[in-house]
Amino acid sequence: MPGQKIRIRLKAYDHKLLDESAKKIVEIVKQTNAKVSGPIPLPTERTLYVVLRSPLKHKDSREQFEKRIHKRLIDILEPSPKTIDALMKINLPAGVDVEINL
């Protein structure tokens, strides 16, 4: 498929799991002789939640919780039908969200 590119966005709370998944995708794509760009680390999305510790008073005493979403981007240039079949069969961990754009 000349001139086509596949863009894969990976999201996860655990950066180690995300890096392992990205490495696995890159290895599989390289086995099918397609060009790979990435994994490119995207900015981490950080959400902070501030909650009062006491339900009644002590407004100065608060707890802070944060949620971090790590992201990676992989571009596959000049994919072949073998590449697409290999990507469909890949088995990734449950904590990784995969978004594929053709």
From Swiss-Prot:
<dbReference type="InterPro" id="IPR027486">
    <property type="entry name" value="Ribosomal_uS10_dom"/>
</dbReference>
<dbReference type="GO" id="GO:0006412">
    <property type="term" value="P:translation"/>
</dbReference>
<dbReference type="InterPro" id="IPR001848">
    <property type="entry name" value="Ribosomal_uS10"/>
</dbReference>
<dbReference type="GO" id="GO:1990904">
    <property type="term" value="C:ribonucleoprotein complex"/>
</dbReference>
<dbReference type="GO" id="GO:0000049">
    <property type="term" value="F:tRNA binding"/>
</dbReference>
<comment type="function">
    <text>Involved in the binding of tRNA to the ribosomes.</text>
</comment>
<keyword id="KW-0689">Ribosomal protein</keyword>
<keyword id="KW-0687">Ribonucleoprotein</keyword>
<dbReference type="GO" id="GO:0005840">
    <property type="term" value="C:ribosome"/>
</dbReference>
<dbReference type="GO" id="GO:0003735">
    <property type="term" value="F:structural constituent of ribosome"/>
</dbReference>
<protein>
    <recommendedName>
        <fullName>Small ribosomal subunit protein uS10</fullName>
    </recommendedName>
</protein>
<dbReference type="Pfam" id="PF00338">
    <property type="entry name" value="Ribosomal_S10"/>
</dbReference>
<dbReference type="InterPro" id="IPR018268">
    <property type="entry name" value="Ribosomal_uS10_CS"/>
</dbReference>
<comment type="similarity">
    <text>Belongs to the universal ribosomal protein uS10 family.</text>
</comment>
<comment type="subunit">
    <text>Part of the 30S ribosomal subunit.</text>
</comment>
<dbReference type="InterPro" id="IPR036838">
    <property type="entry name" value="Ribosomal_uS10_dom_sf"/>
</dbReference>
